[in-house]
C-alpha cells in the first residue's frame, strides 16, 4: 500500500486534472476527496468520455465513479481479499479505507509483484 498519493477535490475541472496530474505523473486513476474522505475515483476511462472542448467546464465529480460503486479494502484485510476485489474491477488500484478515511492506495501491479516474489522465494504470507 502506498500512502503517498495524489488526489483531487470534487470541483476541479477535468482539464486541470489532465494537465496537472494525469499527463505529467502518468496517473491512470485519481482519488476524489472531500477533506480526507473518499467520494469517488476518476480514471482515464472517465476522462475520455468528456469531449476536449468541455474539459474547462466539466468538474471531475460529474464524471468520476462514486465511492458507492468502488471496490475498497481496509488496512487489515488479508491479501486474498484484495486479490478477490481486484478480480471484480478493471481499475488499476483499490482505495484503502480506515474509519471512513482514505489512508492509502493498493496498486494491482504491486500486489501481483508481491505474490510473484513470494512464489519465487517459496514464502507463504497472509499479506
For the regions a language model picked out, list residue spans one by one.
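The conserved cystathionine-beta-synthase
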Residues: 8-26, 34, 51, 71-91, ...
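Bateman (tandem CBS) regulatory domains
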Residues: 1-5, 12-16, 58-70, 126
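Flexible internal linker/loop segments at domain or repeat junctions
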Residues: 49, 57-58
Amino acid at each position: 500500500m502506498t500512502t503517498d498519493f495524489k488526489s483531487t477535490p470534487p470541483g476541479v475541472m477535468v482539464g486541470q486534472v489532465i494537465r496537472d496530474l494525469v499527463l505529467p505523473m502518468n496517473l491512470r486513476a485519481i482519488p476524489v476527496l472531500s477533506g480526507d474522505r473518499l467520494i469517488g475515483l476518476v480514471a482515464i476511462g472517465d476522462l475520455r468520455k468528456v469531449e476536449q472542448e468541455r474539459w474547462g467546464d466539466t468538474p471531475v465529480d460529474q464524471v468520476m465513479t462514486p465511492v458507492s460503486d468502488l471496490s475498497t479494502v481496509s488496512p487489515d484485510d488479508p491479501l486474498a481479499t484484495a486479490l478477490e476485489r481486484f478480480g471484480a474491477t478493471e481499475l488499476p488500484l483499490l482505495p484503502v479505507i480506515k474509519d471512513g478515511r482514505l489512508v492509502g492506495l493498493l496498486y494491482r501491479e504491486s500486489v501481483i509483484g508481491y505474490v510473484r516474489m513470494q512464489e519465487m522465494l517459496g514464502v507463504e504470507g497472509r499479506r
